[in-house]
Curated annotation (Swiss-Prot):
Keyword tRNA processing set for record: no
PANTHER family given in the database record: EF-HAND CALCIUM-BINDING DOMAIN CONTAINING PROTEIN
Record's keyword terms, sorted: Calcium, Metal-binding, Repeat
GO BP field: defense response to fungus
Protein name: Probable calcium-binding protein CML36
Region (Disordered): 22-59
Domain EF-hand: 66-101, 103-138, 139-174, 176-209
Residues involved in Ca(2+) 2 binding: D152, D154, D156, E163
Amino acid sequence: MKLAKLIPKRFFIRSKDRSTVSKSPTAFSFGSASSSSGQDCKNSGGDGGGGSVTPTSILPEVPSPYSYVEILQAFKLIDRDNDGAVSRHDLESLLSRLGPDPLTEEEINVMLKEVDCDGDGTIRLEELASRVVSLDPARDSTELKETFEFFDADRDGLISADELLRVFSTIGDERCTLDDCKRMIADVDEDGDGFVCFTEFSRMMDLQR
């Protein structure tokens, strides 16, 4: 069970600097809300219609913080009906599991437009991969902090095994148990308090890369 692969920071992180919408504290984005997202979509390879996800074996090798296998895993987490395209319904379903605050139609539109290169109203694997490749590596430390805050549900500066399990359950990983989460914490828990602080969380993410 690879934590970094299961929850890629740049796919599910909330965007605090989105200029268009920022109402919901649980509004998650696939990446930064740059107005140049259309340029990021060049050569994305989306076919604009129905069909299956492009096999990872034929996707090009490009510099990216994540492998295409990791991107595919993230894509499958969102594409709940497994039809090869992330629809508005898929996105709304994910966000409803990640937080209690309902998103407005405008917020959903912004999140789709950030990644939907061909404008067909859905997100395909190639479009998501193109978005990830274009992200700025300098944002990594900020996004790591935001990822920590997402796990830390009670905002006490520590992540418990229960909080870790909540995230796995939310995104649909039925295999992860509380004991699994306790073992993951024990691997980086330097002070032995049974919790993970931000420094220890950083080590946890490094170990999962």
